[in-house]
Structure formats: C-alpha cells, structure tokens
C-alpha cells in the first residue's frame, strides 16, 4: 500500500501531476507483473484528499485524471470535516475496488468505528438539498483562505526582507502555512520555544517534528480561525512574536 495526501498536511502542498502520474504508472506496471505471480496481492494507492475542496485554483489533481488505469488499484478518502470547518463532525467516505471496500466495511463493523448514524443522515440530506449552497460556501472559503494565506506569507516575506531569521512556504490548499523560525535552535528543546511563543507572545504553532521531520525550525501555523475581521491582529501578533524572539535570542549568553 502506497499512501499519498494531497493537499498535504502540514505543508499544504499539492502533489505535482507529473510526479503523481509517474507513481501511478509504476503501480499499474507492478500490478501487471504481479498478475502472473501465484498468490501475489495487488499494490494499491491510498489517496487522502480530505483537503481537496480547499485547494487553490486548479492545483488539485486526482490520480484518475492523470492515469485512468489506476482505477482498479485506487482507494480514495474524503470527507467534510475540513471543507465545512467542522473538525468535530467526523463523517467521511471511501471509494475504491469493491472487494477492498467490502473488507474495510467488515472491519469497521467489528470495531464499531462508524460515524454516528444521525450525522450520516444529516450530511446526506444536506448534500442532497443544499448542494448549490455547499458549492457557494466552498468558493467563498477557498477565496478567503487564499487571501489570508497570501497576507500571512506577505508578512513573513516582509520580516525576512528586514533581516529576521524566518522563512515560509506558500500553501496550495488547506488551512495551514509552513513557517520557519530559526530562533528555536537557541532553545534546549522545541517545546521550550513553543511555550515562550504561547505564554509571552500569544502565538500557537505546531513543529514539523511532530509529523516526523528531523529538521528543526519548521512549524505549521493554522489559518482555520483567521478571518478578514481579525487578520490585522494576527499579523501584528506574528510580527511581535518574531521581534520578541529576536530580542530574547540575541540576549542569551552561550
């Protein structure tokens, strides 16, 4: 099983169509070889597209778009908790080869991991009766998130141009921005710097180390609760956090 998440968490990056096609072509070719082998199981692609409805512009590409032959080996996961800003509503869906979906349903029924029935019915009715409104909501949310992302990234570029030890990576979708704060390297532990930002600056971020990264300095900042109403306040908070970090680190005795 090969797993891909696009747009990705925490970076918000969308997989390049040519790269995705290359992966799909290899999977198809591998399965053609396995078809002639006794007791050989297929190689599947698990494609997590939970942030797809929040991708900016035309960046998002599903494996089917670039390699129709992958259909027999593709398992796609999606849901509404991200696109509707309803992270507490864990209702999603999977589509893929019939035998695989059947096995997944059996396992879920045994461990009792179904989404609450009331929420399933509510979502089904909502999509049936309010599909146009849902699409309008998505258009509004994507435009809002893209605008906010550009503004936040612009603030980090401004700070970077002034010589502060920061960097960023502009997202292509989702609700997160990747930021780099070199100041963390002056702290004994990443957690110490996070505590400083929360307690002294009012800024909460998540280090990439929590996602398995070995590189110290990169963090994920969420824009899920940012709107045009509080954007200026958030930008000031970011600037003050960076300036306080700079002052503190420069005053440290090594």
Q: Which residues are covered by each model-predicted region?
A:
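Active-site phosphate-binding strand-loop segment of PLP-dependent enzymes
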Residues: 1-58, 249
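PLP-dependent enzyme catalytic core of the Aspartate aminotransferase-like
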Residues: 24, 186-187, 196-205, 211-254
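Alpha-helix termini
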Residues: 25-42, 66-69, 131-133, 157-164, ...
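Active-site PLP attachment segment
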Residues: 53, 62, 66-104, 115-119, ...
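Helix-loop "lid/cap" segments that line or gate small-molecule binding pockets
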Residues: 93-95, 121-130
């Amino acid at each position: 099983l090969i797993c891909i998440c696009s747009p990705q968490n925490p970076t918000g990056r969308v997989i390049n169509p040519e790269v995705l096609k290359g992966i799909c072509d290899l999977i198809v070719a591998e399965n053609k070889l396995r078809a002639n082998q006794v007791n050989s199981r297929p190689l599947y692609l698990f494609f997590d597209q939970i942030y797809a409805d929040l991708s900016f512009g035309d960046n998002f590409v599903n494996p089917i778009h670039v390699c129709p032959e992958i259909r027999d080996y593709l398992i796609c996961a999606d849901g509404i908790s991200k696109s509707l800003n309803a992270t507490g509503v864990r209702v999603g869906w999977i589509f893929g080869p019939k035998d695989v979906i059947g096995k997944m349903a059996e396992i879920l029924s045994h461990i009792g991991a179904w989404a609450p029935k009331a929420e399933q019915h509510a979502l089904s009715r909502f999509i049936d009766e309010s599909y146009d409104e849902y699409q309008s909501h998505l258009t509004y949310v994507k435009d809002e998130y893209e605008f906010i992302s550009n503004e936040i990234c612009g603030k980090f570029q401004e700070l970077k141009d002034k010589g502060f030890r920061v960097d960023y990576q502009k997202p292509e979708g989702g609700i997160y921005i990747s930021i780099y704060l070199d100041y963390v390297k002056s702290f004994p532990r990443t957690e110490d710097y996070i505590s400083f930002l929360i307690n002294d600056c009012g800024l909460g971020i998540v280090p990439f180390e929590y996602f398995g990264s070995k590189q110290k300095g990169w963090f994920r900042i969420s824009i899920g609760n940012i709107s045009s109403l509080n954007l200026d306040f958030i930008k000031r908070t970011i600037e003050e956090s960076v300036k306080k970090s700079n002052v503190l680190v420069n005053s440290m005795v090594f």
